[in-house]
């Protein structure tokens, strides 16, 4: 029986969160403001039959289907009703409810103010999203399960005018990097952490 590690419904994918996905996903590219569902399970291969259920049950598109060392990931998107119908079908196949998903745990969270040019350079070497600039504030957040990084990114983007530098939602832990003015970064950080704590 698969372990449901996350079951994340996003009612409206925010533009930067969506565009970041577009830099690496191999499936159907979502558009901003569509609904999305992210599912993480263990063992990883159990995501394959769940994908079959989701895409056959409703008119949704799959953007992510990844099996990595331990965990499997699926992201589907489309209209709200279709995404929720597909997600419900997946829960039915698992014999689970959304409440059975693992709760997010914040492992690390910090804000670095007045980012040094050297650190900005190093952060930007490893990113896919926007660039962190010297003098900006940088927020970094790490959590597990990893897929909760997309929820944190989406909620941070809703809350403040920030730049999404990077988020990693696959693996042992998830990570989020965002930058901007100190006030905006603090507001976004609070929104990201609150979104995770609300599920805890």
PLM segments and residue spans:
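Surface-exposed interaction/gating patches
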Residues: 122-165, 179-181
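Intrinsically disordered, low-complexity polar/charged tails and linkers
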Residues: 1-41, 45-48, 57, 103-128, ...
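Short amphipathic alpha-helix segments
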Residues: 44-58, 147-159
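Solvent-exposed alpha-helices and their adjacent loops that cap or buttress functional pockets
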Residues: 28-32, 55, 64-68, 130-133, ...
């Amino acid at each position: 029986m698969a372990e449901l590690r996350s079951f994340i419904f996003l009612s409206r994918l925010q533009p930067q969160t969506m565009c970041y996905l577009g830099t690496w996903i191999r499936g159907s590219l979502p558009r901003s403001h569509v609904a999305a569902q992210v599912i993480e399970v263990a063992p990883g291969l159990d995501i394959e039959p769940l994908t079959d259920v989701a895409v056959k049950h409703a008119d949704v598109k799959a953007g992510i289907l990844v099996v990595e060392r331990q965990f499997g990931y699926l992201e589907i998107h489309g209209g709200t009703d279709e995404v929720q119908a597909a997600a419900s079908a997946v829960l039915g196949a698992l014999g689970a409810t959304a409440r059975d998903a693992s709760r997010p745990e914040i492992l690390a969270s910090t804000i670095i103010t007045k980012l040094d040019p050297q650190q900005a350079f190093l952060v930007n070497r490893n990113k896919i999203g926007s660039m962190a600039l010297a003098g900006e504030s940088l927020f970094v957040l790490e959590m597990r399960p990893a897929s909760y990084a997309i929820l944190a990114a989406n909620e941070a983007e809703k809350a403040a005018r920030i730049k999404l530098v990077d988020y990693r939602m696959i693996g042992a832990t998830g990570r989020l990097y965002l930058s901007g003015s100190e006030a905006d970064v603090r507001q976004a950080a609070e929104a990201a952490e609150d979104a995770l704590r609300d599920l805890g």
